[in-house]
């Protein structure tokens, strides 16, 4: 799709010049790291988390995804040699548990994407409800040798999100966020993602900068590192100049609960496969209600289709608890 006319380009300032880095030293620092990541995302729209996963976990994800590597397809709108594999929840249990259910990412997505809605329910009754985010899509991203530059873009265009310029971040600005974990070395020369830190606060009416903009920064990572980004930040995949190095990322995207999912979770996985997932994941992927009572089946909680004995929402984890049996990071900022 092309646009015949658009507002002219306009230089927009940023308050940050580099991608912030959060170092996760041990599980005891999860709360601190979540707080640091949230603060960094407010300022820059993107941050790198060092040591999110240990090497054995990374290797296990790669091993589980390896049978699907040859099935990686190119997609319309992406550069040549840029391939993806979708539907990862059933392809890699380790990905589902350690990446989708990662405690730090859970805290980040809940902070930025939990929707609060208030209204008069009826005469004399004021109502306030909160809906946690939902899974948007799951992808393994492969940038093969010879892959070209992806165009700078914002991911929230798929959700038809639109923002005016802002001097500082306010909750409600974003419709989605993502975390991408490095499964290989991710260096500038082999196609790592590039960003314009601070562009999440820009006015959407103006065109994106050119690929040689001096404010562009590259998310260079080692296996087990990750970057988190808000869907409002301008970014793109890059040229892989190497002749023998394939850059691989495992990505998870989240969105507000009332939006249509980019990846159709209900057709991607058959119901018998969904029944093998833990309750928190079933709810997060969409078998739950977005307040007020959106997404019902026969006027009931959709999780009852998966498990007729499921507890009503609010009496179990409600989709908020990753890695069942583990402590949940609560982001209180």
Curated annotation (Swiss-Prot):
Null mutant phenotype: Abolishes the biosynthesis of communesin B and leads to the accumulation of communesins F, J and K.
GO biological process: biosynthetic process
Comp. bias intervals (Basic and acidic residues): 323-333
Keyword ATP-binding: no
EC number: 1.14.11.-
Residue stretches spanning the membrane: none
Protein residues bound to Fe cation: 153, 155, 235
Pfam families: PhyH (PF05721)
GO molecular function terms listed in the Swiss-Prot or TrEMBL record: dioxygenase activity; metal ion binding
Gene3D superfamilies xrefs: q2cbj1_9rhob like domain
Names of required cofactors: Fe cation
Metabolic or biological pathway, per its Swiss-Prot or TrEMBL entry: Alkaloid biosynthesis
UniProt superkingdom: Eukaryota
Family indicated by similarity: Belongs to the PhyH family.
The protein's role, per its UniProt record: Dioxygenase; part of the gene cluster that mediates the biosynthesis of communesins, a prominent class of indole alkaloids with great potential as pharmaceuticals. Communesins are biosynthesized by the coupling of tryptamine and aurantioclavine, two building blocks derived from L-tryptophan. The L-tryptophan decarboxylase cnsB converts L-tryptophan to tryptamine, whereas the tryptophan dimethylallyltransferase cnsF converts L-tryptophan to 4-dimethylallyl tryptophan which is further transformed to aurantioclavine by the aurantioclavine synthase cnsA, probably aided by the catalase cnsD.
PANTHER family: PHYTANOYL-COA DIOXYGENASE DOMAIN CONTAINING 1, PHYTANOYL-COA DIOXYGENASE FAMILY PROTEIN
Binding partners and assembly: Homodimer.
Protein name as it appears in the record: Dioxygenase cnsJ
Source species: Penicillium expansum (Blue mold rot fungus)
Lineage: Eukaryota, Fungi, Dikarya, Ascomycota, Pezizomycotina
Gene designation: cnsJ
């Amino acid at each position: 799709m092309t646009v015949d006319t658009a507002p002219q380009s306009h230089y927009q300032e940023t308050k940050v010049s580099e991608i912030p880095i959060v170092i996760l030293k041990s599980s005891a620092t999860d709360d601190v790291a979540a707080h640091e990541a949230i603060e960094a995302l407010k300022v820059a729209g993107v941050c790198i988390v060092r040591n999110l996963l240990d090497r054995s976990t990374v290797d296990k994800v790669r091993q589980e995804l390896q049978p699907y590597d040859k099935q990686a397809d190119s997609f319309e709108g992406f550069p040549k040699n840029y391939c993806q594999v979708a539907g990862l929840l059933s392809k890699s249990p380790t990905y589902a548990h350690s990446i989708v259910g990662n405690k730090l990412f859970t805290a980040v997505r809940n902070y930025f994407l939990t929707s609060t809605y208030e209204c008069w329910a009826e005469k004399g009754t004021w109502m306030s409800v909160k809906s946690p985010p939902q899974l948007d899509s799951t992808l393994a991203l492969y940038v093969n040798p010879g892959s070209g530059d992806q165009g700078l873009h914002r991911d929230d265009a798929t959700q038809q999100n639109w923002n005016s310029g802002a001097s500082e971040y306010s909750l409600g600005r974003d419709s989605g966020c993502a975390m991408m974990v490095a499964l290989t070395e991710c260096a500038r020369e082999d196609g790592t993602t590039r960003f314009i830190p601070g562009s999440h606060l820009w006015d959407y009416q103006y065109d994106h900068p050119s690929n040689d903009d001096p404010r562009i920064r590259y998310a260079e990572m080692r296996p087990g590192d990750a970057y988190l980004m808000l869907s409002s930040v301008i970014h793109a995949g890059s040229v892989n100049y190497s002749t023998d190095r394939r850059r691989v990322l495992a990505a998870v995207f989240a969105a507000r609960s009332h939006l249509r999912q980019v990846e159709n979770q209900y057709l991607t996985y058959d119901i018998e496969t969904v029944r093998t997932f833990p309750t928190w994941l079933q709810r997060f992927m969409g078998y739950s209600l977005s307040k007020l009572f959106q997404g019902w089946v026969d006027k009931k909680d959709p999780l009852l289709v998966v498990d007729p004995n499921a507890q009503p929402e609010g009496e179990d984890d409600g989709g908020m608890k990753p890695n069942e049996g583990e402590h949940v990071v609560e982001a209180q900022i």
